[in-house]
């Protein structure tokens, strides 16, 4: 079974909570939804949090700090399982397209994120808000 791991890094922006999202590059993905920075484990990589950290650095150029697990979802079409980890973005975080895999990487206000994020990943936003309130 395929699996991916990624991060949902957040910060306080001028208009409230913002989250770091990326958009896949290429014509095929032009109209596709945004995503949390994520990817599949490398050969021999069995620590999903380490995978999430590596992918965030590789795709968005941001080094994740302290993280908590947000659980997983399973894509209905591909049956791929996505594991997410959340944490505050480092103060100096300056997202950039650090890989050919993405054409945009930026902090997005959470209300906008709900509209542009892959529909099956939106639950991670809800879980993040629950963790921050609890």
Regions found by a protein language model. Name each.
Residues 41, 113-114, 125:
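A generic structural signal for short hydrophobic patches within well-formed alpha-helices
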Residues 2, 15, 73-99, 104-106, ...:
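Active-site-adjacent beta-strand/loop module that shapes the phosphate/pyrophosphate-binding cleft
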Residues 9-11, 23, 84-88:
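Short, well-ordered beta-strand micro-motif
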Residues 1-20:
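Conserved N-terminal beta-strand and adjoining loop/helix that marks the start
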Residues 16-58:
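Conserved Nudix-box catalytic region and its N-terminal flanking loop in Nudix hydrolases
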Residues 117-134:
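Charged phosphate-binding loop/patch that engages nucleotide di/tri-phosphates or the phosphate backbone
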Residues 63-72:
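A short coil-to-beta-strand element that immediately follows conserved catalytic motifs
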């Amino acid at each position: 079974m395929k699996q991916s791991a990624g991060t949902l890094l957040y910060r306080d922006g001028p208009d409230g909570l913002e989250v770091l999202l990326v958009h896949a590059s290429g014509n095929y993905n032009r109209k596709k939804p945004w995503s949390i920075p994520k990817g599949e484990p490398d050969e021999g990589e069995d620590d999903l949090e380490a995978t999430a950290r590596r992918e965030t650095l590789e795709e968005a150029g941001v080094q994740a700090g302290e993280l908590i697990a947000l659980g997983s979802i399973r894509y209905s079409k591909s049956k791929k399982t996505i594991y997410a980890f959340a944490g505050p973005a480092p103060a100096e975080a300056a997202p950039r397209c650090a890989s050919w895999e993405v054409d945009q990487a930026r902090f997005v206000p959470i209300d906008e994120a709900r509209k542009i994020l892959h529909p099956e990943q939106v639950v991670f936003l809800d879980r993040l808000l629950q963790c921050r309130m609890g």
